[in-house]
Curated annotation (Swiss-Prot):
Keywords: Apoptosis, Endoplasmic reticulum, Glycoprotein, Lipid transport, Membrane, Transmembrane, Transmembrane helix, Transport. One of its GO terms (biological process) is apoptotic process. Ubiquitously expressed. This is Lipid scramblase CLPTM1L.
Amino acid sequence: MWSGRSSFTSLVVGVFVVYVVHTCWVMYGIVYTRPCSGDANCIQPYLARRPKLQLSVYTTTRSHLGAENNIDLVLNVEDFDVESKFERTVNVSVPKKTRNNGTLYAYIFLHHAGVLPWHDGKQVHLVSPLTTYMVPKPEEINLLTGESDTQQIEAEKKPTSALDEPVSHWRPRLALNVMADNFVFDGSSLPADVHRYMKMIQLGKTVHYLPILFIDQLSNRVKDLMVINRSTTELPLTVSYDKVSLGRLRFWIHMQDAVYSLQQFGFSEKDADEVKGIFVDTNLYFLALTFFVAAFHLLFDFLAFKNDISFWKKKKSMIGMSTKAVLWRCFSTVVIFLFLLDEQTSLLVLVPAGVGAAIELWKVKKALKMTIFWRGLMPEFQFGTYSESERKTEEYDTQAMKYLSYLLYPLCVGGAVYSLLNIKYKSWYSWLINSFVNGVYAFGFLFMLPQLFVNYKLKSVAHLPWKAFTYKAFNTFIDDVFAFIITMPTSHRLACFRDDVVFLVYLYQRWLYPVDKRRVNEFGESYEEKATRAPHTD
């Protein structure tokens, strides 16, 4: 049995190593491009000729531009310098068609200075929608006074039935890039990702590619979107520019394609936005480090999950285990799942949280020795009996919870009342769930203390799932490293460090109460027997 479990763990680790190595090789193939080695079949950069360029941004309601009619010039950058970074905010007129739930497009032209873009044969251009369709976020109000952050005009208020309909939202950012590397491509092995952004021209006997213009769609975040009302006539648009290297450009193209594929598979704009958040404003080297850390986090999560399930599957007795702590973990994971559901969190986060909540419910069933009988559609619960040793553990557990309640309940009630008076919510249910989840994050570690108290009273830690604890501890320390780097709620950030304190106390108790390796555990095994047991021979 032991060798089988060990072999499975080795297999998982082996597959993980192969996956990491393969991913590194694929990433290397994306960011590295082999330059042209000879003179034949080489494609030279047009930017190397140092042309005088101009950047022009137009808006129109049409997705295909046939002529210069019905377009508005919103930004004109003369003497455009590819090497110079800039950011400018302009006011864009919103046409009536767009205000009536229509779409507005931006046309970005990079052309020779002093020449209109549609008269320049060497111009490059891209088109990007400045609007997107989304279901508007429910309005948050003060539940006691009924006041909201933005008081709507009565004429603009929509009926309740229309609140779930997608409406046009404004994208206030337009991020532009130009590939500034004077890279010489090999015409026989052009990367497919960059090729679709390239426009080639013949100058004498040499083929040149015009400046590669790119729109960074990953910078468009859901949190920045603005609802377009019928009374809106102008909206701000921040146009930013920065040069980009060939390696980063290829990587960004692949990432945008991946996000687009998610949307094609049915992911909503909000789900795709969760993925965008990983890449926006992130250094490539830090992004690579994040990938490796996330990969190890996933491995430790799986190993902790496997060992935790294995431990509880064989668990027949609750001697030395805090039932209150098990109940609390179940309650907290269910509350966090409902909170994520109320916040309309991405399925990438919601599904694992739901699986974790289901597992904690199963643990409660094991801890309470609960058997469920179905009489038609009505369930009937039957609870098992506890032994004398289990009742002693339960007595210590109840004693710890009694002392803990004197501190915990006033803090939770006070926090809930404070949030009700000062914070706006969508509904009473939203306030209730937020109050619970804030209590879980802020004071949840206190519910780990009954297990420490039981360990202290019994002078033993042999009953705890130490393998699962170890893997979870690795993940906790990984979370600490990124707690002040990755964007997350402050309460969740503090929760990362509070778990460290409790785990260090667990380690101290393990040192203080060493496990007797000669003692037979509840499964009829001892550590020394496992080590000295000879293989069976027929």
